[in-house]
Structures are given as C-alpha cells and as structure tokens.
C-alpha cells in the first residue's frame, strides 16, 4: 500500500474536525524534522510526530577559540561562550492554549526603542526586561517554569555533559565549486583551458536538463547548522563563560543555542 505523506502546521491540525474522529488519532513522537509529519501505517491510521528538545537550553554568544590544558597536560581546543543579560522565560506555551508545550526564552538586553511595539508589549506582559532574541524550546514537560524566571547555565549543565550547539555559519558569499564543494581543479598547463571550471553538469538530449541538487557554484555559508554531542570542558562562574570542546558555528559575537545532547536510549526512546 502506498504511503501518503504531507507536511502541515499544527494549528491547522487542531482546527480539523477529523481529529476527533475514530479514523484520525494523533500520536506525538519525537522526530528529526521540526515540522509536523502525518503518515499512515498499518496499525494506526495517522501518526503525528514533532521535534522536541531533550531538555531546556540557553542562548549564548561566541567569544572565540583557545587551547585548554587539562591536568595531565593534554591540550584541548575549546570555544569560549559568554552570556549576556537574559536567558529569561518570557512565555509558557501549553497544549491547551497553543497546541504544543514549549518554553519561550529571551536573550540579550536592549533598549526599548530597539524593539517594535508588539515585541515590547509581549515582554511587558511577562514582566521581563526588553530583549533582542526570543526562541522556543519544545519540551515534553513544562512544569516548574514560570514567566520572568531566569535560567542559569551552571544550574542546567555541568562539566562533562554533552550538548548540541546550533548557530549560523560564517557567510562566504558566492563561491565556486572548488571552495564550495571541494572539487579537484584541472591542469594549469599543457594546453588546458579549464582550470577551475566544473566540467560536465549533465547529459545531452536525455534528460536534456540539469538535475535538481547538482553541486554548482553558489552562495556559501550563512546557513543554520547544529553540531551535536560536544563536551563541556570548563564552566567558569566568575567570568560567566563556558568552554566547549571543538569549533562552534559562526564568528565571534554569533548567537548560539545550547541544548542537552540527544542520545538514543538515554533521553530519546529507541525505535
């Protein structure tokens, strides 16, 4: 039997009268995609799955990279992440009112005139300071959170924990195939006329077109990415910074989203 798949938004699902019917029974399961996915299966008519975090996270600012020396002399490359004023709960979203459970966090204090009136009103309703960035963390349990609650990094994470860090990569602009996709260049001598050109990008009459997704020159970087299972090497309460092993997305000053690492069998159920 063919499997029908469609991506829809959650509010539209709640407005559908078919949710209450016996043929449509939604079941919420963690998935890789942040969108809601409806698919048919032999046992259940439809299964609704959405992406959720393994736990509450925080936002921080990338400061740069350095070398950290452990007690045995081992040198570990780390990225230093600092925290501006913020990481305050601005809204609690529930399944009854919003269609899903989530905690909205604000980060980086700014002046009032830097925000729009709707943004200012939203933060004033929560009783928080004006903040530039607002992000949601979808959780399976939102108990224990309240508006204007401040989240402290060392109360959520500790040294040795594994985290997932998301951010925007450094933009490189329009680049060729060699830099963007690591293609091998052509000969520079012996009469070669193609030094850094792509070469063939497809066949002739059949199919007579270039396939979608073909690796070609284009805009490089400046995209959202996530690096998973990075180790927290050091938490410095005095300097209000944390050192995370490895490189993190973006350049110094970039906004980072730090969440507990998703590990199958630990905080994610096995299939």
UniProtKB/Swiss-Prot annotation:
Statement: the UniProt record of this protein carries the keyword Ribosomal protein: yes
Organism superkingdom: Eukaryota
Organism (species): Arabidopsis thaliana (Mouse-ear cress)
UniProt region (Disordered), positions on chain: 190-222
Complex formation: Part of the 50S ribosomal subunit.
Molecular function terms, GO-annotated: mRNA binding; rRNA binding; structural constituent of ribosome
S-adenosyl-L-methionine among keywords: no
Keyword set, alphabetical order: Chloroplast, Plastid, Ribonucleoprotein, Ribosomal protein, RNA-binding, rRNA-binding, Transit peptide
Gene Ontology CC: chloroplast; chloroplast envelope; chloroplast stroma; cytosol; ribonucleoprotein complex; ribosome
Gene, per the UniProt record: RPL3A
Disulfide bond positions: none
Name of the featured protein: Large ribosomal subunit protein uL3c
Pfam families: Ribosomal_L3
């Amino acid at each position: 039997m063919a499997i029908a798949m469609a991506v829809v938004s959650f509010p539209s699902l709640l407005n559908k009268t078919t949710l209450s019917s016996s043929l449509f029974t939604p079941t919420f399961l963690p998935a890789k995609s942040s969108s809601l996915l409806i698919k048919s299966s032999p046992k259940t008519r439809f299964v609704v799955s959405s992406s959720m975090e393994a736990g509450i996270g925080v936002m921080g600012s990338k400061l740069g990279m350095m070398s950290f020396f452990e007690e045995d002399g081992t040198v570990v490359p780390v990225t230093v992440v600092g925290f501006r004023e913020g990481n305050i709960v601005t809204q609690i979203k529930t399944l009854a009112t919003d269609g899903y459970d989530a905690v909205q966090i604000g980060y980086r204090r700014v002046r009032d005139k830097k925000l729009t009136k709707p943004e200012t009103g939203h933060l004033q309703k929560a009783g928080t300071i004006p903040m530039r960035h607002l992000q949601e963390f979808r959780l399976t349990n939102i108990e224990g959170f309240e508006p204007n609650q401040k989240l402290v990094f060392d109360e959520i994470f500790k040294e040795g924990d594994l985290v997932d860090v998301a951010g925007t990569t450094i933009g490189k602009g329009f680049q060729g195939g060699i830099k963007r996709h690591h293609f091998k260049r052509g000969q520079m001598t012996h009469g070669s006329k193609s030094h850094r050109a792509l070469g063939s990008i497809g066949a002739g009459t059949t199919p007579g077109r270039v396939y979608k997704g073909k690796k070609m020159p284009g805009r490089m970087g400046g995209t959202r990415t996530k690096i998973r299972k990075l180790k927290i090497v050091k938490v410095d309460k005095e300097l209000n910074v944390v050192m995370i092993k490895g490189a993190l997305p973006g350049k110094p000053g970039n906004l980072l989203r730090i969440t507990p690492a998703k590990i199958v069998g630990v905080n994610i159920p096995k299939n």
